[in-house]
């Protein structure tokens, strides 16, 4: 079976032989969640990097973003690079920043959230599927 060419619903911001930095738009899934035929960033990157994959490379998403979230995604193109980025993530040596849209007018210009985060829909009604909230049972930010 011949795979269809990638749709390129995203932009490559930076690329080397080892990794790519992708600007993911909102509502583009990172990985397949169910077999409904919906295109994902991972599938599109596999099509885009088919030559590298044929030569022994891979597509490893280092940091994921929720479906509603837009932003930069780091993609390793080799197993050893994916392992190294994974170690850096575990040790929190890769910095992640989020710009949040808030309701109202906060009294602060910027703030740091260092609290447990969980899916709001697990604890109260949320119109957004993966809307995050501070909750004691959540994972560290």
Language model region names:
Residues 1-141:
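RNA pseudouridine synthases
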């Amino acid at each position: 079976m011949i795979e269809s060419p990638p749709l390129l619903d995203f932009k490559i911001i930076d690329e080397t032989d080892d990794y790519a930095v992708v600007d993911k738009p909102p509502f583009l899934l990172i990985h397949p969640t169910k077999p409904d035929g919906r295109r994902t960033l991972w599938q599109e990157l596999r099509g885009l990097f088919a030559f590298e994959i044929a030569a022994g490379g891979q597509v490893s998403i280092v940091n994921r973003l929720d479906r509603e979230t837009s932003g930069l995604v780091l993609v390793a193109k080799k197993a050893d690079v994916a392992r190294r980025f994974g170690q850096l993530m575990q040790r929190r040596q890769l910095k992640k920043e989020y710009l949040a849209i808030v309701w109202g007018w906060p009294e602060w210009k910027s703030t740091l959230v260092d609290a447990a985060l969980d899916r709001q829909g697990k604890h109260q009604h949320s119109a957004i599927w993966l809307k995050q909230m501070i909750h004691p049972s959540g994972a560290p930010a």
